[in-house]
Regions:
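Terminal amphipathic helices with adjacent charged low-complexity linkers/tails
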Residues: 39-46, 227-244, 299-300, 305
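A conserved regulatory-domain signal marking ACT and ACT-like small-molecule sensing domains
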Residues: 238-402
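Short hydrophobic alpha-helical runs that function as membrane-insertion/retention elements
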Residues: 167-171, 225-227, 289
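Acidic-aromatic/histidine active-site loop/patch
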Residues: 218
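Nucleotide/pyrophosphate-binding catalytic subdomain
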Residues: 1-215, 382-383
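Short phosphate-binding/catalytic loops that engage adenosine nucleotides
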Residues: 33, 89, 223, 286, ...
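Surface-exposed amphipathic alpha-helical tracts and adjacent flexible/coil segments at the periphery
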Residues: 210, 221, 232-237, 312-313
């Protein structure tokens, strides 16, 4: 069997944890399996690199930031390979250039295009554990790029797909996927399994266990995912196409406090205006989520939407640059908000799910500012100060602890 194992920064934060990961991988290796390990930067090292960069230049070029960021993962993989050597197991560390991990040229948020697996396969044939840098790639100009938030998850899934691995195991500081963040909802329960679609929505909406791009890729290529803890040997949660047990009405509740709302006031109420608005944002690679259009005054309309907090400055700058083309009157932004979502394939065949969610929020005195729905998701925008209380109320309303 070929197993890809990805470990995040907290899992390799110090010597003790590095050896904990190494011993776990050696156990797999000694079963006769091929092992590829994908690592993030150690602990909070990426934050340290950001601080160092901003001390030199408060607006550092994105290309140079990508070059700097690659140091973190390269440190992790080289130290891990040294740990394997100390344990008497042959291993080799490889960075994105050595693996030939080809990406687009969008610095800070590149997309993987293809992976040349020849080097990895050659090392596996030589009975080595292969330790690969997550989060990074190389563009057509041979410049380093980074894959953005959750990039190491994406690297692991992409490698698993390219190598036709038997499984891709994502190790975190929690032991699986829960019905809610157990740090915010003490009654949260671990799920044995969840569908790709449910996990994708939860990941997109704030559940930090897996990144949405990695789930998209796993679904596209049919990569079996397992989310497990790096600190214990519990079974974890399997993410797959279909669950084998009866679908739950609701699989989970997610809270995203990183979102911000932007309101574009006084747009002309004519065909194509929404397209023009979101097209200028798309060209800057800014993702929008919850969207609300309302009637303005005297032949105008207002459009509100949410973006990730890190994209706020770019979004505002882009809209201001295009004010003449868009013809809006005012621009407002709001930070102290939260997106609260419920996700579950079971809601497709059960009416009244949204009403039950709204009732639980009403009973808690939580005001809803915006609403967005899909077949398996309901999302509301609320005040950030109400977020955790609302999350627990909704979790209780759907009896997710049982």
């Amino acid at each position: 069997m070929l197993i890809v194992k990805k470990f995040g920064g907290t899992s390799v934060a110090n010597k003790e944890r590095i050896y904990n990961v190494a011993n776990r991988c050696v156990e797999e290796y000694k079963k006769g399996n091929d092992v590829v390990v994908v690592l993030s930067a150690m602990g909070k090292y990426t934050d340290e690199l950001i601080s160092m960069a901003e001390d030199i230049n408060d607006k550092p070029p994105k290309r140079e930031m990508d070059m700097l960021f690659t140091i973190g993962e390269q440190m992790s993989v080289s130290l891990m390979a040294m740990a394997f050597d100390k344990l008497g197991v042959p291993a080799v560390s490889l960075n994105a250039f050595q693996v030939a991990m080809h990406t687009t040229s969008v610095h800070g948020n590149a997309r993987l295009k293809r992976i040349d697996t020849e080097r990895i396969r050659r090392e596996l044939e030589n009975h080595k554990i292969v330790v690969v840098t997550g989060f990074q790639g190389v563009n057509k100009y041979d410049d380093y790029t980074t894959l953005g938030r959750g990039g190491s998850d994406t690297t692991a899934v992409a490698l698993a797909a390219a190598l036709h691995a038997d499984a891709c195991e994502i190790y975190t500081d929690v032991d699986g996927v829960y019905t809610a963040d157990p740090r915010k909802v003490p009654k949260a329960r671990k799920l044995k399994e969840i569908t790709y679609d449910e996990m994708l929505d939860l990941a997109t909406l704030g559940a930090g266990v897996l990144h949405n791009r990695s789930v998209e890729m796993a679904k596209k290529y049919g990569v079996p995912l397992v989310v497990r803890s790096s600190l214990n040997n519990s079974e974890g949660t399997v993410v797959k196409e279909e669950v084998t047990v009866e679908r739950m009405l609701i699989s989970g509740v997610a809270l995203d406090t990183e979102a911000v709302r932007i309101a574009v006031i006084g747009l002309k109420d004519v065909p194509g205006m929404a397209f023009k608005l979101f097209d200028v944002l798309a060209k800057k690679h800014i993702n929008v989520d919850v969207i609300l259009q309302s009637i303005g005054s005297a032949g105008t309309k207002d459009i509100s939407f949410t973006v990730d907090g890190k994209d706020l400055d770019d979004a505002i700058a882009t809209l201001e640059e295009n004010k003449a083309r868009l013809g809006y009157q005012e621009l407002h932004s709001e930070r102290n908000i939260a997106k609260l979502s419920i996700v579950g394939a079971g809601m497709m065949s059960n009416p009244g799910v949204a009403a039950k969610m709204f009732e639980s929020l009403y009973n808690e005195g939580v005001n809803i500012n915006m609403i967005s729905t899909s077949e398996i998701r309901v999302t509301v925008l609320i005040n950030e100060k109400d977020g955790v209380r609302a999350m627990n109320a909704v979790h209780d309303a759907f009896n997710l602890a049982d």
